[in-house]
Swiss-Prot record:
Alphabetical keyword list: Cell membrane, Cell projection, G-protein coupled receptor, Membrane, Receptor, Transducer, Transmembrane, Transmembrane helix
Pfam assignment, any one: 7TM_GPCR_Srx
Localization per Swiss-Prot or TrEMBL: Cell membrane; Perikaryon; Cell projection, Cilium
GO biological process: calcium-mediated signaling; cellular response to pheromone; locomotory exploration behavior
Free-text function comment from the UniProt entry: Receptor for the ascaroside pheromone icas#9 which suppresses exploratory forgaging behavior. In response to ascaroside icas#9, may furthermore play a role in the expression of genes in the TGF-beta signaling pathway, such as daf-7, and in insulin signaling pathway, such as daf-28, which may in turn contribute to exploratory behavior.
This protein's name: Serpentine receptor class X-43
Membrane-protein topology: Multi-pass membrane protein
Family: Belongs to the G-protein coupled receptor 1 family.
Disruption phenotype: Insensitivity to ascaroside pheromones.
GO molecular function ontology, one term from the record: pheromone receptor activity
Gene3D superfamilies, A to Z: Rhodopsin 7-helix transmembrane proteins (1.20.1070.10)
Tissues and organs where the protein is expressed, per its UniProt entry: Expressed in ASI sensory neurons.
Length: 319
């Protein structure tokens, strides 16, 4: 696990002079967030338009992607205005952007956990599924998710006076140097991501193995199309959970793997760059694993025929 010397980084920031490297780092993250913005919006619209996703799983997907869209806009706004354009008033309130991202982190992860739990229950408790994921229960799950994250974030920011601030050295957000907060903020973000990611992947693996091993019993009364869709949904959430788990490991240990001696860029690629790349990767996984999304995308956005053939061939190969 890499130890980032926040005190030294704060001292460096006191003599900070804007350079082309700052503009480059800001532009890279801005482009990531802009790409993620369009993809996440497409997923959200698709969830409302596609008949197969007008379901409990689709509602949970909308909740997760809305939370991730908010994180994407938050990060993209700061990177464009503060890092790329070096607007001082924006930089001076970096803690507002950072604290908001800390609040959204558990919302996004718990949303993924709810999606995994949904697939788990659909597989192992089909007779109770409608009760477990009725409209009222889904609303309860979602409200509880946001309230729990709000309470945890409020405790960190208000009670323990923790702030997630921007450092020019490495172009990253990290906890501010505070006696009352200490390392609590770092431990919170790392532990919640690790615990929830492992739980998500564990649920997904159990569900996917059960679907593959007992598909004839689980879906004996369902059509081939329904079986394929359920496997696709399960594959989607297991990949997304695994990516979050790998990202947590990369965040902590990627610094030792990267070549070169410039710690600024090593910090950048293991934190800000990789974190915001998730805004792009997650919706791409959705499109890759869901035939309904691809059909809807091709039909509504006039994707060239050549690209259709390529995706069809890849999809057939994966099948």
């Amino acid at each position: 696990m890499v130890l980032r010397n926040l005190t030294a980084m704060a001292i460096y920031d006191q003599t900070f002079v804007y350079s082309s490297d700052d503009a480059l780092a800001g532009m890279v993250v801005s482009m990531e967030c802009l790409t993620g913005l369009f993809l996440l919006v497409a997923v959200i619209i698709g969830c409302f338009r596609i008949a197969a996703l007008k379901s409990p799983f689709g509602i949970l997907m909308i909740n997760q992607n809305c939370a991730q869209l908010m994180a994407c806009i938050n990060s993209g706004s700061f990177s464009t205005l503060g890092v790329l354009l070096n607007i001082k008033p924006v930089l001076s309130i970096s803690y507002l952007f950072g604290n908001f991202s800390i609040f959204l982190l558990p919302v996004i992860l718990i949303s993924f956990l709810l999606m995994s739990f949904n697939r788990f229950c659909a597989c192992f408790f089909p007779l109770r599924y409608q009760n477990l994921f009725s409209s009222s229960m889904i609303r309860t799950f979602i409200v509880f998710n946001w309230l729990l994250s709000l309470v945890a974030g409020s405790y960190l920011v208000v009670v323990r006076e923790c702030n997630f601030v921007f450092y020019h050295f490495g172009w990253l957000f990290a906890g501010s140097v505070s006696v009352k907060c200490g390392t609590l903020l770092s431990l919170y973000s790392i532990s919640i991501q690790t615990v929830l990611s492992i739980t998500i992947v564990g649920l997904d693996v159990v569900t996917l193995v059960a679907l593959m091993a007992f598909r004839s019993k689980v879906y004996q009364s369902h059509s081939v199309e329904v079986r394929r869709r359920e496997l696709s949904f399960s594959g989607q959430v297991i990949i997304q959970g695994a990516v979050f788990l790998c990202h947590g490991a990369w965040y902590d240990m990627g610094h030792a793997i990267l070549p070169g001696n410039d710690d600024r860029w090593k910090f950048f690629f293991t934190t800000s760059f990789s974190s915001n790349l998730l805004h792009v990767f997650d919706p791409v996984v959705v499109f890759a694993f869901n035939k309904e999304f691809r059909r809807w995308l091709f039909r509504n956005f006039n994707v060239p025929t050549a690209q259709k053939r390529i995706v069809t061939v890849v999809s057939a190969h994966n099948t």
